[in-house]
Amino acid sequence: MKIVVAKNIGFCFGVERAIRTVEELLDEGKKVVTDGEIVHNKQVMEQLTKKGLKVSSEMTDGEVFVVRAHGIPKDRLEELKKIFPEVVDLTCPIVSQLFKTAQRYAKERKVIVFGKEDHPEMVALRGYAPAIVTKVPFKLEEKKVVFLSQTTSSLEEYKEFVAAMIRMNEFEEAVFLNTICPVTVNREREVEELSKICDLSIVVGGKHSSNTGKLFRIASKHSKTIWIESPDELPADVVKYGTVCVFSGTSTPNSLIENVVRKLKEMEGKRDGTI
């Protein structure tokens, strides 16, 4: 079995920044509170809660409230500043830029965002600008529009959505902006190419992670593909595949990927009788 690990793996800079900041606050002995997953990764959240991070939508007792990487609505942010002595905004810079862009364009045209309506990033965005969030093309009366995208969406799927919207409607002015995170686009392209030479693709990441799900869908077009959160989920028959490729979402730590590779080698060793 040949194991090929993608070059673009591990945390993106926004996730790394968020986790590092929370760990530093906890190491200082501060009572740190948040209202959901800092990042969409179960193992990372378990580690942070063990260190003392409190997660609750109702919690008001704490010294520091940390805003998740996905962001929160503007009015909610202002409320939190009145409740907590310190609020640390860990919204990813690329996500923050999306919010500002939507807010700016909403003054002059209808904002249409390609994304999952219930995703935390999209919930937060609607707190900055009145926007239609959907992945399904539809008819619209407005003639002036701007197209934006959730930062973790597939670029190709986004382009297809915009093309369908333009075919279905008679817009006088339609602005198309690529607001997808370049880190996720690079991973998307690597998975698109590398999965073509794989007998099995393994995508490692949280089951609630949009960007991980995107990589899973792309790899599935070209090879047998599985989506796992931990090495324990590797199937026993993984050793039957000749070339196994390992990919990861942007909320997946390098340590977890290393553990998956280690487990694969152990399974191969047991099959060959070398362990």
UniProtKB/Swiss-Prot annotation:
Keyword field contains NADP: no
Swiss-Prot/TrEMBL catalytic activity: isopentenyl diphosphate + 2 oxidized [2Fe-2S]-[ferredoxin] + H2O = (2E)-4-hydroxy-3-methylbut-2-enyl diphosphate + 2 reduced [2Fe-2S]-[ferredoxin] + 2 H(+); dimethylallyl diphosphate + 2 oxidized [2Fe-2S]-[ferredoxin] + H2O = (2E)-4-hydroxy-3-methylbut-2-enyl diphosphate + 2 reduced [2Fe-2S]-[ferredoxin] + 2 H(+)
Pfam families on file: LYTB
Pathway annotation: Isoprenoid biosynthesis; dimethylallyl diphosphate biosynthesis; dimethylallyl diphosphate from (2E)-4-hydroxy-3-methylbutenyl diphosphate: step 1/1; Isoprenoid biosynthesis; isopentenyl diphosphate biosynthesis via DXP pathway; isopentenyl diphosphate from 1-deoxy-D-xylulose 5-phosphate: step 6/6
Gene3D superfamilies in alphabetical order: 3.40.50.11270, 4-hydroxy-3-methylbut-2-enyl diphosphate reductase, catalytic domain
EC number(s) recorded for this UniProt protein: 1.17.7.4
Manner of cofactor binding, per the entry note: Binds 1 [4Fe-4S] cluster per subunit.
Protein origin, superkingdom: Bacteria
GO biological process, one term: isopentenyl diphosphate biosynthetic process, methylerythritol 4-phosphate pathway
A GO term, aspect molecular function: 4 iron, 4 sulfur cluster binding
Entry binding sites for [4Fe-4S] cluster: C12, C92, C181
Residues annotated for isopentenyl diphosphate binding in this entry: H40, H70, H119, S209, S210, N211, S251
Key words of the record: 4Fe-4S, Iron, Iron-sulfur, Isoprene biosynthesis, Metal-binding, Oxidoreductase
Binding-site residues for dimethylallyl diphosphate, renumbered to this chain: H40, H70, H119, S209, S210, N211, S251
Ligand binding ((2E)-4-hydroxy-3-methylbut-2-enyl diphosphate): H40, H70, H119, T151, S209, S210, N211, S251
Single GO cellular component term: cytosol
Residue numbers annotated as active site: E121 (proton donor)
Cofactor: [4Fe-4S] cluster
Family listed: Belongs to the IspH family.
Function: Catalyzes the conversion of 1-hydroxy-2-methyl-2-(E)-butenyl 4-diphosphate (HMBPP) into a mixture of isopentenyl diphosphate (IPP) and dimethylallyl diphosphate (DMAPP). Acts in the terminal step of the DOXP/MEP pathway for isoprenoid precursor biosynthesis.
NCBIfam families: ispH_lytB
The protein, known as: 4-hydroxy-3-methylbut-2-enyl diphosphate reductase
